[in-house]
Amino acid sequence: MANSIKQVTVKGSKFNLGSIESAAIAGVEQGENIFTGGNNHGVKLLVAGAANTVTAADSGKIIVFNVAAATLCTLPAPKIGMKFTFITSILATGDHEIQAATNGHGFLGGVTVDSTTAAKADAFSANANGADDFITQTGGTNGGGAGSIVTVVGISDTSAAGCWLVSGNLLAVGSTTVTPFATS
């Protein structure tokens, strides 16, 4: 071991190091650890196409639309407290869609849609009856710009309209903005 550090001082306070901490310092000193980025266990990257599904095990994760092409992501059956945060990291050139698992599931709540190219913004709500089961961002007037974010939270354990609560801010392109919510 190049350095036998046994104690460190942080903001004037001294701390004794145990064997594990000393070994970690030695490993870093010897260049044995390569740090390439943060922990990505809380992130799920979507691929182009309609084969993307999030599961109950993905609850709490950040779900990333990271390809411009059309991408569909289907939600699981709802459970109270289940939460998914969808982020768009690239301007959509095809539809970026979030779909409820069945037509019987649906969204409540709403999002804002802000144009990045014109002084235009508006707020849109899902149908109050919970019938909307799609959120579609095209990269145009209804969101899909890089930086768009949608959070979906399960508010019912039953397969019923209005079992998902939605909030978010979508970035659009153009002089008009339109709703991203639809029934199909």
Where are these regions (language model features)?
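Sequence/structural signature of small/polar-enriched beta-strand/turn repeats
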Residues: 2-4, 88, 112-114, 141-147
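Exposed extracellular interaction/assembly regions and N-terminal maturation sites
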Residues: 8-15, 21-124, 157-184
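Structured beta-strand segments within beta-sheet-rich domains
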Residues: 121-148
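Extracellular disulfide-bonded cysteine-rich modules/repeats
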Residues: 146-156
